[in-house]
Amino acid sequence: AVGDTITSQPSGEQAEVKKILVADHEAESAFKGQPVTIQLNREVDVSRGCVLEKGSHVRQAANFKAEILWMDDVPLSIGKNFMVFLGTKKIPGILTKIDYRIDINTGEHVEATGLKKNEIALCEIAVTEPIVLDTFDHHRTQGELILIDRISNMTSACGVVTDTSVYDK
């Protein structure tokens, strides 16, 4: 709402909401999911991937766990570099660990050091700096991701964040 103090994450900078525009008309407040333009009372570093919050404390992490579906013809190996698209943020990242592969016929967790096309696994991913994220179950937009191969620019995997609790800021 106009007059509220908000925080831009991940920078932590605060400002007061001076004006809200909804469909080019001034409004006193905005609601979740509404496309809006917000004018602040001072200049704040806000760019694609930043999250504006009021009162809540969003999670930030540079490491997280995600359940991914491997879609690339080239097998996945630990240490592979990607561009990670998470929420509205695009950031370099690396797959650091495969906790287990999920057998799609039995649901069994199977030890794995790589993945082939159409296999699903729980993996650990590290990005180059802390980003705002949440589990998919808690916040769909901040919990879904795509992994893009940095050489071929092809979509290699899609997935959902399953665990940030170990890495909370």
Predicted regions and their residues:
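C-terminal effector/interaction modules appended to NTPase cores
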Residues: 1-169
